Amino acid sequence: CIQILFLSLIYFQSFASNELDLGTYIVKTNTGYELIRNGENYFVKGAGGYQYLNQLKDIGGNSIRTWGVDNAKQILDDAHKLGITVCLGLWVGHERHGFNYDDEYAVEGQLESFKKIINEFKDHPALLMWAVGNEMDLFYKNFKVWNAVEDIAAMIKSIDKKHPIMTV
């Protein structure tokens, strides 16, 4: 009987810890849309960049957005320690910087590199959502960039069903 009780406690403890991470999603309401994180309304009070996490926390901020994934693990870990969430940016190649969206190998390579990143960070407790790109439409002519963005978003959703995706 004690063994059953012990096993039940282990089972329910692991079940409860799995339920804590309910993910982040958007719901439509009568007045618009709301961001829900781990089952509760979440209002972003954030900043771009990660250099001033302590100051952001001190003034009541709760979220940051990055432009890319350089130092992503450290940023996510540091943010988590402070109770700050991260909208993790995925820097998409820019035509104005020489990225060629007619080059299928380059586009596929970009997608594959993002796959590794999604798998690495999708379960990090500080992750709020993904931000695909940053001003890719500034001075561009090749509309295939949007096909790539759509493919990236579909790939993310196939791997990570717990976090929304936005483009910037």
Tell what function each PLM region has.
Residues 29-30, 36-168:
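Active-site mouth of glycoside hydrolases
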Residues 1-7:
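Sec-dependent signal peptide recognition
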